[in-house]
């Protein structure tokens, strides 16, 4: 079964949406519950596909997961953790990349882990080499088997001195989840320090972990023998908040995003203001709106935190197609993130992608033949067309482009968007979008 979204564009999105816990934190906090010897409670949990996948994987490994029918809070009890068959893991994981993060906690809990061949959004190589190398440095034995990789640690996991060649969020999460119960001290240099990483550290600290974050991207973890449970409210999803902000700009709308956090979005908010977007920052959220005038072009470079997030880039590029002048966007985090512009060009956008680094500083992709810089000329009138969603953020970007376009667009592959956007079609309907959903076999 697959769904097709038929969008009739040209209607400004106006109204209110609510944003809950971050996709880039909640599944990892759920995995962290495996490390404890007591139940954990996770609050502010969104209803997204990634949460469903992790719930299934944890239940498969013997973890009891109970969802509060009223507020959606999750209670996770790992006391009966057990091994699971590779076939079952593969069936439950689907195309999620979460299973790699289960490895450290599973080794601590039951002595072994299996990860199927991984999927995820098709926006770059996203190699798991960092993860496997990290696990080896902790003393894990990594074996390739049919359909995936088996990981064990006959002598247990031991602290290590680890240096990442790039501040990878996934590799940093792997270190945190593996080191907290490893014997000895782990020192991680070149770590990612995104707000979701800090929130994961807060979760682990509540469980009894000893973790310190230094100013030079170094994280120090003192291993402890046992951890308890946690009671934690997940931080809000800054990526979803930024997506709705861009949607307001693209459709000349006015959206109040309940739950949007100024503290975690300051770099985005500065850029939004430079483009010409309006905002009113309140205690419970942020109002984003098109001020009625021209949008300004800009030069933008994505980077790791505290820079401009790569996940913010794609929706904002759609807004830049409506800016008056030439904008330049240099993507330094994922090498193939501009594939989504093909559909925008078919809709009438004027976008050229380049292999050269068009930012202020040459990046790691400059000599590797990747199309990682874009030149956007505007404003251009977007026209409806048929679109197949390529990845999570690119897919949402296509949606808001279709909502701003003249005419009708047919969007397929929208199930991908459910991975990170809670009830997005309900929210679109509440904002006044004109669309229909049909289901095909």
Residue ranges and their predicted role:
Residues 1-441:
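Short, structured segments at the rim of ligand-binding sites
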